[in-house]
């Protein structure tokens, strides 16, 4: 087993056979080409020469693809610098919005609409509850970031929200709740569930949804209705992480999340002729790291 391998090595070894047995979209094919050819000379080179000693250095250009693990550091730093003007020296909290896994087939078949619905439900929940005088009674700020994967490379759409811990009331006075988050998690859960499910139902009633693969049964009204009932009955589980330690930590944390891809090079621990092994957090075991070996479907 080779241990010194990268995402690029994995694509070089497995992509051609994967492409021959799977339906690949033009966007996916373009990303794969970029990853396989990044910093190889395929995108040109820069040559620099030292005027003193005459030493010549050749630098291969990167692909700059959003999905490439080798191309995120510079965009991240550029984005972080731009956000410094937006961050206040005030408490911030990290709230994560998730949906029941039963919805995954429909979301996967309707990514444009149902990713947008995630943003709508999360942002409306935060804004409306924060404006309620029972909780804070202010107009707050937040940044929402969509991730579509879990640590084990599974399909797991969820929203990371970085929430300002205070805001301006109707008299334009600043108001916050100190180091404690100002919204009850159970209230967030019920509100978010109601808003997301309402938009999902509206899309179904307006015949805007498509049903491919494992989502096909939900084209039937009664099967779809049963799915809605199942999801309404479940307790949706958003959670709030501890507050950040100052504005700079907020910015750094944001950069990590906005420019993260599904898996990075350091998590690839080995590769054979038929499998790839990578490390992942096991959230069913207190977030301890474990190794997972999978076949070419990686």
Residues covered by each model-derived region:
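Beta->alpha loop/short-helix hinge microenvironment recognizer with preference
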Residues: 1-298
């Amino acid at each position: 087993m080779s241990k010194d391998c990268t995402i690029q090595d994995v694509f070089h070894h497995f992509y051609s056979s994967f492409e021959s047995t799977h339906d690949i979209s033009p966007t996916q094919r373009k990303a794969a080409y970029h990853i396989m050819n990044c910093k190889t000379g395929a995108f040109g080179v820069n040559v620099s020469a030292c005027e003193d000693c005459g030493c010549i250095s050749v630098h291969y250009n990167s692909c700059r693809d959003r999905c490439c693990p080798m191309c995120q550091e510079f965009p991240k730093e550029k984005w972080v610098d731009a956000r410094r003007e937006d961050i206040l020296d005030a408490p911030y909290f990290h709230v994560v919005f998730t949906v029941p896994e039963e919805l995954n087939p429909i979301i996967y078949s309707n990514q444009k609409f149902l990713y947008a619905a995630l943003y709508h439900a999360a942002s409306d929940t935060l804004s409306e509850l924060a404006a309620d005088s029972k909780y804070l009674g202010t107009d707050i700020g937040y940044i929402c970031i969509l991730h579509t994967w879990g640590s084990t490379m599974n399909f797991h759409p969820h929203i990371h929200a970085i929430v300002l811990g205070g805001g301006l009331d109707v008299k334009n006075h600043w108001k916050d709740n100190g180091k404690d988050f100002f919204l009850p998690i159970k209230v967030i859960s019920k509100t978010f569930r109601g808003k997301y499910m309402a938009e999902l139902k509206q899309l179904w009633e307006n015949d805007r949804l498509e049903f491919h693969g494992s989502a096909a049964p939900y084209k039937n009204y009664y099967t779809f209705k049963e799915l809605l009932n199942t999801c309404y009955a479940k307790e949706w589980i958003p959670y709030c992480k501890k507050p950040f330690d100052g504005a700079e930590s907020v910015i750094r944390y944001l950069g990590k999340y906005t420019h993260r891809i599904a898996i990075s090079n350091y998590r690839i621990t080995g590769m054979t002729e038929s499998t790839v092994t990578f490390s992942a957090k096991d959230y069913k075991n207190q977030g301890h790291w474990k190794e997972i070996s999978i076949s070419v479907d990686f």
